[in-house]
Amino acid sequence: MFVTPAFAQASGSVVGPDMLMSILPFILIFVIMYFLIIRPQRTQMKKRQEMLNSVRRGDTVVTGGGIVGKVLKVVDDNELELEIADGVRIRVVRATLMDVRVKGEPVADNKNK
């Protein structure tokens, strides 16, 4: 008996400022997330990529596994040859480098001799 009048009432449509006010918190959360998380992560990734691209012969580097070595030669765009002890050479993938500890002096090529 009492249910019939409730169904007979017209529902209010959500148009106008009420709709904007319901979406505004989600927009604000996304903007805050962009400036606190996404943007700093992009700059950090850009710095890391620049560091990886600037590795050259003579640099002392640390790999992801904690191996410290000196770059003997750049094999190609993705691989480096490191000397981790006297006479011990290993090849590593450039992306596994975590840090460049000491930037070495630029080594002159032997082509001029």
From Swiss-Prot:
The chain crosses the membrane at residues 18-38. One of its GO terms (biological process) is protein transport. Pfam families: YajC. Signal peptide: none annotated. It is found in: Cell inner membrane. SMART domains: YajC (SM01323). Its main location: membrane. It is a single-pass membrane protein. Keywords: Cell inner membrane, Cell membrane, Membrane, Protein transport, Translocation, Transmembrane, Transmembrane helix, Transport. The keyword ATP-binding does not apply. It comes from the Bacteria. One of its GO terms (cellular component) is plasma membrane. Part of the SecDF-YidC-YajC translocase complex. The SecDF-YidC-YajC translocase forms a supercomplex with SecYEG, called the holo-translocon (HTL). Belongs to the YajC family. The SecYEG-SecDF-YajC-YidC holo-translocon (HTL) protein secretase/insertase is a supercomplex required for protein secretion, insertion of proteins into membranes, and assembly of membrane protein complexes. While the SecYEG complex is essential for assembly of a number of proteins and complexes, the SecDF-YajC-YidC subcomplex facilitates these functions. This is Sec translocon accessory complex subunit YajC. The lineage of its organism: Bacteria, Pseudomonadati, Pseudomonadota, Alphaproteobacteria, Hyphomicrobiales.
